[in-house]
Each structure stands twice: as C-alpha cells, then as structure tokens.
C-alpha cells in the first residue's frame, strides 16, 4: 500500500492507496508545534481504527507547503515506517514542463494538482484549489503548467473582516439565504460568500481570455463543494485531486 501525505497550512490530508484505489483518507489539523512522535501516535490511532497496520505501507510520498513540517514528517516516515519518503520538489520527475519564471517557486500542491488534472482529462484545464490560499492554475493542451493566480482564502478573508472591523462578530462560513441580508451575521456571510464566488468566476474568466482557450475548470480543496454550486465557471469538483496527483507522481518516480 501507498501512503500519500498532503501538508497544507491549515490541514494535513492523508490517504492510503491499494494500487489505484483510495481505500482510506483522513484530514487532521496542521500543527507546527507537534513532533514526529506526536504525529506518529496520531497516525497509529487512525490506522488502528481503520484496521490497518504500518507494516502494510510499502512506500510514502509527501507534498508540503509548510517547510518546518517537511522534516518532521520525513522523520515520522523513517522512525515509524522504516521508509524514506518521496518528497515533491526538486529532483522529483513530474512529466510536466513548468512555464514559470522560477519553477522552484511553484508550490508543490499546485504542481501535484496540475499533474493529476492533466493525467485524468488530457485537455486544457484551470484548477481552482480552495485552501488557506485559493490558487488558480492553468495547464495548456500540451500538458504544460503555465502559471496562474493566488488569492486569499475564504477563511482568511472572513477572519480579516472580524479582526479589522471592531464591531463585527466572528461568523461561520456558509451559503447565506439571500444577498440582501437582514442582519449583521447574514450580511457578512453574504458579502464574503457571494463576493468570493464573484472573485472565482472573475479570475477564471480572465484566465480563459488570456489563454485564448476554453479549458475545463476543476475545483478541489476543503471549500470547493460549498462554492462550486454557485459558480458559473466551475465544471467539476474533484475532492481527492491532490491525493491522486501524489499517487501518480509516486508511480513516475518509483
């Protein structure tokens, strides 16, 4: 079995693949203060609840946008699984040309998503990943990663509104019933939610215009299922796109 680990700023998503089949997946909070032993104990509990054992894992691949945790998780892999993990970054064969001023600047998660998206669809794509930041990535018909845009995530935007406007409360992220809201909480939710839908559609349309193409638009990430139904541009939600990309990269580098 293959263990794939996607380390984001807010969450770590883990998956277990048996061949091409994703058999289990988990989402835990990202905590830079945890040690490799603490993550190991947590992972042992998750494995036990799923009737899995560490000995069943024969390979591990990690994508991380949190550098302090990369080494911690590498230690976890060596100490608990006795395996050196593959880490997405320089030296990993992606099979994709990166059309970027400095390819090393492209986040590992963005490359992983691009690889998975093109492998599955074999057509031009825009991939919208709703994470701590929301990323927009364009892959052309040749399968080349062409760049994209980065915007503040939905949660960051909502938290900034609470922090910087002293009379406004902290509210949950949800789809409000109306854009013309009748109370402060719904007004904030309407502004953030519908404003963010407009941001997504606006950036996607601009990328389409600049690309002179009609790419398929994939959405992934924790809040994709919330935003996609209101979006005019998102064609499909792929919840496990990043995990699938890690599996594909493992196959290309094993």
From Swiss-Prot:
Active site: 109 (proton acceptor)
Keyword Ligase assigned: no
Residues that hold K(+) according to the record: 129
Signal peptide: none
Top-level taxon: Bacteria
Binding residues for substrate: 100, 107-110, 184
Cofactor: NH4(+); K(+)
Enzyme Commission number: 2.7.1.33
Chain sites annotated for binding ATP: 6-13, 132
Molecular function via GO: ATP binding; metal ion binding; pantothenate kinase activity
Top-level enzyme category: transferase
Ribonucleoprotein found in the keyword field: no
Major localization class: cytoplasm
Family matches, as InterPro entries: ATPase_NBD, Type_III_PanK
Keywords of this entry: ATP-binding, Coenzyme A biosynthesis, Cytoplasm, Kinase, Metal-binding, Nucleotide-binding, Potassium, Transferase
Pathway this chain belongs to: Cofactor biosynthesis; coenzyme A biosynthesis; CoA from (R)-pantothenate: step 1/5
GO cellular component: a single term: cytoplasm
Cofactor note (record): A monovalent cation. Ammonium or potassium.
Family, as annotated: Belongs to the type III pantothenate kinase family.
Known role: Catalyzes the phosphorylation of pantothenate (Pan), the first step in CoA biosynthesis.
Quaternary assembly: Homodimer.
Record's protein name: Type III pantothenate kinase
